[in-house]
Amino acid sequence: MPKSGRDGGASKDSKYDLSKISARVDRVNVSGLLRTHNDYVMRAADGLFKASNFQDLMLEAMSTKSYLHELGIFKDVSVHIDVSRGADASPQGYEVTFKGNEMSRMMGSAGTEIGQNEGSLRTELTIPNILGRGENISLQGSYSSTRANDLQLKFWKPFFHTRFKENRPEMSFSIFRQTDRFDISSFQTTNIGYLVDFSAHTMVGVDLTHSLQYENAIRDVGLLNKSVPFAIRDHCGPKLASLLRYSVVYDNRDGNVFPTRGIYLKSVNEYCGLGGNVAYTSSTAHGELNVPLFAGLVAQFCARVGVVKETKNTTQLPISSLFYCGGPLTLRGFKFGGAGPVVESTPIGAQSFWCTGAHLWAPLPFAGVFKNLASHFRMHFFYNIGNNNSFSTENMRSAFGMGLAVKLAERARIELNYCVPVRHQDTDRILNGFQFGIGYEFV
């Protein structure tokens, strides 16, 4: 029997350097393709044929498995690696087989969805892989009792199987009906139209996510009550908006909700006036910097800025495209839209705004005892500063406080803060005390 221990030839703790075991892939099989065309998965094996040792083979096999999942055609994928057999087998050859289980011809789902300071009920009916190369058709509907309701029919086409697969190009066409309520200003907008979207990644120096959209929609502004100022009534009625929208995102954070390090940058630019009777340009930018300190403490600095301007074809800036500053996602200590210009005590939105936030995040005191539970909670101290229709520090608003945040599945968070407004204007709607917020992008 072999000995165990330092002098033995075999040990339960023996380790092998897989990078020193020569290996090459002779053949790759993908089984389970029922409705999918073969050329859609052909490029999945590109990395496997470059493997020169067993460690590379294992890593590339896992990468290929992830790639097959991203194609959007399989429920699950399993990997089998076996020695290569047959007359054409090489001495260190292996055969890799991926067994996939294709998605059903029709799928449905229902659940909740987190938006910016709102939650909604969402249902979706999807026909996946309809043409055999990852194309999807989906009918989506969402309902919220607070702000927005949506109905959307969407056709989505990925191009992951092309030679540009590393760029993850995607294209979609949507027909939508969207209703947004602005209770603070007593109006709502109903948009009916279509949207064409093309998105891709670029990795020249840094990894950026780009999205280029064309939207054509009828925007109808309606009133929620009779006692609305004329400045808002003047915007009522349907108008046709035709616009281009470009957005770019850079994100190297180590987490979406409670990051400990990294930078997040996002920019959205719109040009409206390609047709119809609505014309303007709009730009918004959001930035976030996270710096680890000690004992689990993290310093976070956030900023957001937005500007909407007239063009030579502008007759009136649409009220739904103006900025509403204030609320738990921008300026804590103020009600939603409560830090901005007003007409007859009614907020009407601003053509520009800026706000910043400094945070000190800390784990809960008992984080070491209840590790799994405590990882979903954080305490923070914050100080927010902002203003609208002016980029100076005169007449700016500010507030500080502390609160508790809860993570929701790495996608959003809930905050319960105690806020103390420091600087505000007489017409502002302040909130001195507890404030509740839910969303995925905070300042």
From Swiss-Prot:
Organism whose genome encodes this protein: Drosophila melanogaster (Fruit fly)
Name of the protein this chain belongs to: SAM50-like protein CG7639
GO molecular function: membrane insertase activity; protein transmembrane transporter activity
Quaternary structure, from the entry: Associates with the mitochondrial contact site and cristae organizing system (MICOS) complex (also known as MINOS or MitOS complex).
Residue span(s) of domain POTRA: 23-101
Entry note about domains: Its C-terminal part seems to contain many membrane-spanning sided beta-sheets, that have the potential to adopt a transmembrane beta-barrel type structure.
Topology relative to the membrane: Multi-pass membrane protein
Alphabetical list of Gene3D superfamilies matching this protein: membrane protein fhac: a member of the omp85/tpsb transporter family
Keyword check for Membrane: yes
InterPro entries: Bac_surfAg_D15 (IPR000184), D15-like (IPR039910), POTRA (IPR034746)
Compartment(s): Mitochondrion outer membrane
Function, in words: May play a role in the maintenance of the structure of mitochondrial cristae.
Family named by the database record: Belongs to the SAM50/omp85 family.
Principal location class: mitochondrion
Source species, domain of life: Eukaryota
